[in-house]
Amino acid sequence: MSAENSEVSNNGIVIIGAGLAGWHVIDAIRAKDKDIPITLITADSGDRYHKPMLTMAISQKKSAADLVRATGVDAAEAANIKLLANTQVTDVDASTQQLQLISALRSDPVYTNYATIGYDKLVLAMGAHPIFPKSLPEDLVWHVNHIERFGQLQEKLATGSQHVAIVGAGMVGTEIAEDLLKAGHQVTLIDLNDAPLSQMLPPKATSRIAQAVNSQGINFLGGYQVSAITRISDGKLQVSYEALASATDSSTAEPIEPLMVDHVIASTGLTVDDKLPTAAGVDFDRRTGIVVDAPTLRTSTANIYAIGDCMSINGVACRYVAPLRAQAATIADDILGHEHNGYEHKPPMIRLKNKAISVMVTGVPQAVGNWQVKTESEDELVMDLLGDNDAVSATVTIKAPAVPKG
């Protein structure tokens, strides 16, 4: 496949976002070109760390500093790039290929001046940010989508056993629940659905996950929604919740006693900020993110690419780590003018990182569909999701953990 344009002037390549996606692009470009100018812009320090470790680190007694593989400054020096840390992009002018910047420290009057920077090729690697429903005030709840917030929560939890409520029993929420339990905390996991992972798997599969979660000692509240969170006089949080209207007759339902907890973690999904994509004029889907051309990862605007959590391919958000290396290699080849075969998106294997139960999913799962049992026993369940012409579009394999030999 031919590259878009091999001409890159002194402005060089600008990457917005210093998460796994942004650094993967830098690694891929530097593997092919040691000298082309690269500028990395990030609202934080740009430190390199492996985000999936955040859901496993508290039980391992790892602090945020322990998870950092290289500081942003050291990584930038090693990669021969310019790092603009603690810097936010406020506007993209695609016609002039200019970005407007302001310091992320602008609460200090010293840092209120705007600056501009030009680009020849722009890579949007800005990720996605947590969704906070109205019932989950951002100033009262935590999220673990970023190492800085994780570090703040880890410091609070390191003082002793506490009661933590987690709202949302998807992959991340379910993993965090087990990690906190292993660390000695009391855990309540709340979800709108009757079982964890219900948005991607059928009830026959998720019921096994719910059983495993409960058997550990996690208090799973399925079929409930949080209605309010308030801080009370002793510093604890009062979590009010109610059964979903579809799950009970509200005329006969008895009031539910609120939970009293020390912390609340929101694990209620991710969304992509549309401000920069809109300014750049790129096609954008409010549900899935920046729309890209699958073989090249180019957006609809010339000289702009997207990668990672902020992008979508064929209407599907790409929010897994496994494909990042191949995506970055494609962008590197395309930017540098190298012939390449084009990126071929393959759904990654999804694995729940819980010890209480093994859950592995391949393909593109969805909760509702023609799921057929392939293998079923007390210790194992294998189901296939059949699509048109009975083609297998997804497979879930659930296994009970191996019993240690005594």
Predicted regions and their residues:
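Short beta-strand/turn micro-motifs composed of small residues
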Residues: 17, 42, 168, 191, ...
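FAD-site-proximal beta/loop scaffold in flavoenzymes
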Residues: 139-161, 258-326, 330-333
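Rossmann-like NAD(P)H-binding beta-loop-alpha module
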Residues: 152-201
